[in-house]
Design a protein with these regions (language model features):
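Conserved, well-structured core segments that form or line functional sites
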Residues: 1-190
Length: 190
């Protein structure tokens, strides 16, 4: 694990979530590079009834309780994968869901994988996982190394970030732990 990345991600999930906006995910697939900008995130931790880690460590959530900077991938609705960046100190059960990304390099290759165009390509957590071929094989992956890397960027000005309620959850609905780049067309739901 890259020390700078680990140090950056050791903060609580609700602190890291807005800081990930504007950061880059680089995905290597079959010798091709795809680069996307993170435009929407949601924070979760073990104190949060909406979090997978709320009821403690299980085989499914073990990654969330590990070191920061690893990928937590889960299968949902019997058909889709979603990916999260583990945050906080080891043992805290915290992660940030990547809800939407904007292609900046390799968009055509993403469309070859997920044959849709425009914002529908990656404006949701399952859509971006399909377009980047993120599945259970990457669960526990170190995000400082290939084939999927998180590249930190300078923080986005807070005036350009919207903070609101999270999407598609049945518990802790009023917690304002969803963050997105205001006005970005790739945001899943406004």
């Amino acid at each position: 694990m890259n020390k700078n990345l680990s140090d950056f991600l050791q903060k609580p999930a609700n602190v890291v979530a807005p800081l990930l906006l504007g950061c880059i995910l680089e995905r290597e697939i079959n010798g091709k590079t795809i680069r996307v900008r993170i435009v929407e995130t949601e924070a979760y931790d073990e104190t949060d009834a909406a979090s997978h880690s709320y009821k403690g460590k299980t085989p499914r959530t073990e990654i969330m309780f590990g070191d920061p900077g690893y990928l937590y991938v889960y299968f949902t609705y019997g058909m889709h994968y979603c990916c999260n960046v583990v945050t906080g100190k080891k043992g805290t059960g915290a992660a940030v869901l990547i809800r939407a990304v904007e292609p900046i390099e390799g968009e055509q290759y993403m469309q070859d994988i997920r044959p849709v165009s425009g914002v529908q390509l990656s404006n949701g957590p399952a859509k971006l996982c399909q377009a980047l071929e993120i599945d259970k094989r990457l669960n526990g992956h170190d995000l400082s190394d290939g084939p999927l890397r998180l590249v930190l960027q300078d923080p986005v000005d807070s005036d350009l970030i919207t903070q609101t309620k999270r999407v598609g959850i049945s518990q802790a609905k009023d917690v304002l732990w969803r963050f997105y780049l205001t006005g970005n067309e790739y945001v899943s739901k406004v």
